């Protein structure tokens, strides 16, 4: 890129500040990258990419490439100014070496180097270096290529010049240390691509490329001129928008930049995603509160002034005006304060005021200029308000006065005797016959059984009042005890294991998906707390004489058959449904904690989960067809 703003805002070794040493990182890596699981492994990539993004935010870089090399190392290349290579005064070493070997050294702490920076907690390159068996850095700067190599954070040799160049930028290649990342050191292309796409949406001037050079070669390029406006269109691509063009707002005040884009659709759920300096603020925060407050106020004001809301009508609540809303709120803040359980909640009070004023002014203008769209938005809110009132009545009917009242449920729930949620589990079972076997086979002390008669309602296509009129949904809500939506309380969960047990056929998979959609939309916290599990009943029963063995997949079946003597010929039964097993078999294979296998449902990426549920369970056929075609190659067992 051309040398813009260089004089007024130099970035050299004098900008690099040093805060503390590196020894602790290898001892307690979780403190610096969250965990040493696959999540922490991928976090290493973002620490390096975030440094390149900082260069882009400062206006010096417009291309970032990430490649997974054949040896599973990662190479990150940018065309920024290149990390400074001059001697850093305090340490007496080249600035690039200080950045790579000293914790909390970098240009993002003083304010002179970068006005706004992303890198989570600014731990940066030194942590990646400490947790890698080897790291190489190539700096293209001032006409020379500077090179240094490190092993587990320690320089192998001094920084040296290895050639001439007419370009600027930094190339970092690192290989994660298997001593630290014992679970896995294998990078997932899709995980990296998802975040690269998100960064491209959030930073409209950057072209990001991700390439996999391993066996299954693939490459993706992301560059969105529309920025977060394109992001909203992407998120709504499988929905029916109420207005064609997403609303886009930007403004800044006191060094804080605010961008908001939103679009309403015909659906009933809302998806608001907020970001600060490219970090997804999962727990929301002041910027999100400012946006929601402005949205509710502006829509109510417009509805009143234009007599869409009558004098006798109550004001629409935030919940009402957010029905069917997809929105991105992205701010760039020079000094963000993060709080909350996972440090993903913005705490700066000024971010609320600035977001509120920037957004409300522009959104008022949008409604005035688009009266037809404005009317649709207000009317959608009034419909949601009616449904909310109806749902409240329905909810009051289902609300139990005490945990003991479950016994009065009409013969559905066979509860356990334990009242300790930490050891109690509930099996949600498909069909009465399987429910009967499960009731007889269970351990009554800690296992409760809830049989479902049929398929529960598809919550993706219905408003809350309709959902709450569904018997199966009401029974599930009452049995689990947490309530739903705004009244949800995780402390009231009666079981810390909610186990979905369905047949291993297409119908079973559909029921499982309907249940997961319901839990995701209305009880998301029980997924986030790790309370939802999927039972794994066996697919095959192998009997030879009196000896019976169970196989949970084709591979296990092959292994069992290979180990059995040829005579007498073993009998193989393929289970189509849970009802084919007697109570003892169901206990031995699927319910006994000593031998059973359970899949825990986790939520890695809320945005991706949201898209997937919308594609699979929403109204539009085309996105669903595309999803099936793209994922068909991963299907192992097809039940036709």
Swiss-Prot record:
It comes from the Bacteria. Pfam families: DNA_gyraseB, DNA_gyraseB_C, HATPase_c, Toprim. A type II topoisomerase that negatively supercoils closed circular double-stranded (ds) DNA in an ATP-dependent manner to modulate DNA topology and maintain chromosomes in an underwound state. Negative supercoiling favors strand separation, and DNA replication, transcription, recombination and repair, all of which involve strand separation. Also able to catalyze the interconversion of other topological isomers of dsDNA rings, including catenanes and knotted rings. Type II topoisomerases break and join 2 DNA strands simultaneously in an ATP-dependent manner. It comes from Bacillus anthracis. Belongs to the type II topoisomerase GyrB family. The record marks 455, 458 as: Interaction with DNA. GO terms for biological process: DNA topological change; DNA-templated DNA replication. This is DNA gyrase subunit B. Heterotetramer, composed of two GyrA and two GyrB chains. In the heterotetramer, GyrA contains the active site tyrosine that forms a transient covalent intermediate with DNA, while GyrB binds cofactors and catalyzes ATP hydrolysis. Residues 424-538 form the Toprim domain. InterPro entries: DNA_gyrase_B_C, GyrB, HATPase_C_sf, Ribosomal_Su5_D2-typ_SF, Ribsml_uS5_D2-typ_fold_subgr, Topo_IIA, Topo_IIA-like_dom_sf, Topo_IIA_B. Keywords: ATP-binding, Cytoplasm, DNA-binding, Isomerase, Magnesium, Metal-binding, Nucleotide-binding, Topoisomerase. Few gyrases are as efficient as E.coli at forming negative supercoils. Not all organisms have 2 type II topoisomerases; in organisms with a single type II topoisomerase this enzyme also has to decatenate newly replicated chromosomes. Binds two Mg(2+) per subunit. The magnesium ions form salt bridges with both the protein and the DNA. Can also accept other divalent metal cations, such as Mn(2+) or Ca(2+). It catalyses: ATP-dependent breakage, passage and rejoining of double-stranded DNA. GO terms for molecular function: ATP binding; DNA binding; DNA negative supercoiling activity; metal ion binding.
């Amino acid at each position: 890129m051309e040398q813009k703003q260089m004089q007024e805002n130099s970035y050299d070794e004098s900008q690099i500040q040093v805060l503390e040493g590196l020894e602790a990182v290898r001892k307690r890596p979780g403190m610096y990258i969250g965990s040493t699981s696959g999540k922490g492994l991928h976090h290493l990539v973002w620490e390096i990419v975030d440094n390149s993004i900082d260069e882009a935010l400062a206006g010096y870089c417009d291309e970032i490439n990430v490649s997974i090399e054949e040896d599973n190392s990662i190479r990150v290349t940018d065309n920024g100014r290149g990390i400074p290579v001059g001697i850093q005064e305090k340490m007496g070493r080249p600035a690039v070496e200080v950045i790579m070997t000293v914790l909390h050294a970098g240009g993002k702490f003083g304010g002179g180097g970068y006005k706004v920076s992303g890198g989570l907690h600014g731990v940066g390159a030194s942590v990646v270096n400490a947790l890698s068996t080897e790291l190489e850095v190539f700096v293209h700067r001032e006409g020379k290529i500077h090179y240094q190599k490190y092993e587990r954070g320690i320089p192998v040799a001094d920084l040296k010049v290895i050639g001439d160049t007419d370009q600027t930028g930094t190339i970092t290649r690192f290989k994660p240390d298997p001593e630290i990342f014992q679970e896995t050191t294998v990078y997932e292309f899709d995980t990296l691509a998802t975040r690269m796409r998100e960064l491209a949406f959030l930073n409209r001037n950057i072209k990001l490329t991700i390439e996999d050079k391993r066996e299954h070669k693939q490459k993706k390029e992301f560059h969105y001129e529309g920025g977060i406006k394109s992001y909203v269109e992407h998120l709504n691509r499988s929905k029916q928008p109420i207005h064609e063009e997403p609303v886009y707002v930007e403004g800044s005040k006191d060094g804080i930049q605010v961008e908001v884009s939103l679009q309403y659709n015909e659906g009933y759920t809302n998806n608001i995603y907020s970001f600060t300096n490219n970090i997804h603020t999962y727990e929301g925060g002041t910027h999100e509160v400012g946006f929601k407050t402005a949205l509710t106020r502006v829509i109510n004001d417009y509805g009143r002034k234009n007599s869409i809301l009558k004098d006798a009508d109550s004001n629409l609540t935030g919940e009402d005006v957010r029905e069917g809303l997809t929105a991105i709120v992205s701010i760039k803040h020079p000094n963000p304060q993060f709080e909350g359980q996972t440090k993903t909640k913005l705490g700066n009070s000024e971010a609320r005021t600035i977001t509120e004023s920037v957004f409300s002014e522009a959104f008022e203008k949008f409604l005035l200029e688009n009266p037809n769209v404005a009317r649709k938005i207000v009317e959608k809110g009034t419909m949601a308000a009616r449904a909310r009132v109806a749902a409240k009545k329905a909810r009051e009917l289902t609300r139990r006065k005490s945990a003991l009242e479950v016994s009065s449920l009409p013969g559905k729930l066979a509860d356990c005797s334990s009242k300790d949620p930490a050891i109690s589990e509930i099996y949600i079972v498909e069909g009465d016959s399987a429910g009967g076997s499960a009731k007889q086979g269970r351990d009554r002390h800690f296992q409760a059984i809830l049989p479902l008669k049929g398929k529960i309602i598809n919550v993706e296509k219905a408003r809350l009042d309709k959902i709450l009129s569904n018997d199966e949904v009401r029974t599930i809500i009452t049995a689990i005890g947490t309530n739903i939506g705004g009244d949800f309380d995780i402390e009231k969960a009666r079981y810390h294991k909610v186990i979905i047990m369905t047949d291993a056929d297409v119908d079973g998979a559909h029921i499982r998906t309907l249940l997961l959609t319901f839990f995701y939309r209305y009880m998301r916290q029980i997924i986030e707390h790790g309370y939802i599990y999927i039972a794994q009943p066996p697919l095959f029963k192998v009997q030879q004489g009196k000896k019976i063995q169970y196989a949970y997949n084709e591979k296990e079946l092959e292994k069992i058959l290979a180990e059995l003597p040829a005579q007498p010929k073993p009998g193989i039964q393929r289970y189509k449904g849970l009802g084919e097993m007697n109570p003892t078999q169901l206990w031995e294979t699927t319910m006994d904690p000593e031998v059973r296998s359970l899949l825990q449902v986790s939520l890695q990426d809320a945005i991706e989960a949201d898209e997937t549920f919308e594609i699979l369970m929403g109204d539009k056929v085309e996105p669903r067809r595309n999803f099936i075609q793209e994922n068909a190659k991963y299907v192992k067992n097809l039940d036709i």
